[in-house]
Amino acid sequence: MFTDFYFIYSKGKLSATGCVYAGLQEQSSPSNGVWWQANLIGRYNITDALSVTGRIEHFNDPDEVQIVPVTGVKGFQSYSSSLGLNYKVAENVLLRLEGRTFFSDKYVFVRGEEQVKNSNTITSNITIWF
């Protein structure tokens, strides 16, 4: 079973979205696998072509239905936050650069050969739509 709830807000140069996803996976073990995720995303349009985006989210999967930590730790729970810069190159092309940090109370991430409780990434992408 899967369900979600979300909202979308937009006024002028500011927009926000938020959502909560939840799932229940039948398992052969005594408990069914329940997982959920929630996030909040805000965007501010500096110009028609340039915007900045911030995001916070939480993911909880104690029964490892969606995510199994590679570190061998039982269950997965993590928070994350990010800040991104978007540049609209053309009407249907977007460039994005984003810095993101993940936090957990368990050693679910790997850095080199070490198990750690947080992870930092910088990603970029090109989105093209038709």
Question: Model-flagged regions — what are they?
Answer:
Residues 1-5, 36-40, 79-83, 120-124:
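Hydrophobic, lipid-facing positions within transmembrane beta-strands of outer-membrane proteins
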Residues 1-31:
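Oxyanion-binding "anion nests"
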Residues 5, 18-22, 40, 54-58, ...:
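Transmembrane beta-barrel strands of outer-membrane/channel proteins
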Residues 8-11, 44, 87, 101, ...:
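Residue-level signature of outer-membrane beta-barrel architecture
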Residues 13-18, 49-53, 87-97:
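Repeated loop/turn-to-beta-strand initiation elements of outer-membrane beta-barrel proteins
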Residues 21-29, 60-68, 100-111:
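Sequence/structural signature of outer-membrane beta-barrel proteins
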Residues 87-94, 99, 116-130:
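Outer-membrane beta-barrel "beta-signal"
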